[in-house]
Amino acid sequence: MESWARCIFLLLLQILTGGRGDILHSGAGKIVGGQDAPEGRWPWQVSLRTEKEGHICGGSLIHEVWVLTAAHCFRRPLNSSFYHVKVGGLTLSLTEPHSTLVAVRNIFVYPTYLWEDASSGDIALLRLDTPLQPSQFSPVCLPQAQAPLTPGTVCWVTGWGATHERELASVLQELAVPLLDSEDCERMYHIGETSLSGKRVIQSDMLCAGFVEGQKDSCQGDSGGPLVCAINSSWIQVGITSWGIGCARPNKPGVYTRVPDYVDWIQRTLAENHSDAYGCRSRASGAYPALLLVLLAFALPESL
């Protein structure tokens, strides 16, 4: 029974990723086992950049002037003039057609973020200097505040993360990953890590996604990017790529900021800065997301 369920799980992942045979093989480095994202599939994905370093993090558009990303992407003292956001396109090239570079007006980091590795509150909002036109973007939907997230739900992570040679992906990568139970993730992170003995690693505002065997979903350069799930025919951002121990290591899945815990703060920040409520129009097309959720509810518990 266990092997049969696992076969179903692997087959579904191959269908969703275009039949790639390397979906569960670790070692490549970037979004491990991912594939090039089709044009227009993830229209909210942006690249956070500095003039000196180029691409440093991902992010997601939630409004015509607002980007959601990770707090650890920034350095203190905060200086918005150091940063720009590239909107549109699939590559990191600044000359790519249908893309634009927008200056950042303000940076809002969650007040309790500690500016240290694996800190809670790893979330930030960027206010763009110039509003985007409706033809330039499609915002991702945000979840309801404190919405529960079900382990086993298959979601998607995207980004231009680094390879093991520390090179960035030339084209935006996408990968389907299952959400993991937080207590299971906590136990995994303590395996082989004596320095973590007695310490709580996965905080209540974090969630894990990836593969127990070591097939990590994201790597350096993916930070700040979105983890989205197809829920009620819409793409909902449930996580922000935050941290992990290495890339593609067994028992060290990707850790994400749990977006439902911060929806109230996001709404309050937008309201305090005279922005109307965000609105999304990102429909999850195709039958695969719904099919995957139905079948994985049966197959995944025995396969992982």
Swiss-Prot record:
Q: Which UniProt keywords apply?
A: Cell membrane, Disulfide bond, Glycoprotein, GPI-anchor, Hydrolase, Ion transport, Lipoprotein, Membrane, Protease, Serine protease, Signal, Sodium, Sodium transport, Transport, Zymogen
Q: Where is the signal peptide?
A: 1-21
**Residue ranges constituting the Peptidase S1 domain according to the UniProt record:** 31-271
Indicate yes or no for the key word S-adenosyl-L-methionine.
Answer: no
Q: Where is the active site?
A: H72, D122, S223
- Listed name of the protein: Serine protease 30
Q: Name one GO biological process term.
A: proteolysis
Q: Which SMART domains match?
A: Tryp_SPc
Q: Can you say where in the cell this protein is located? A: Cell membrane
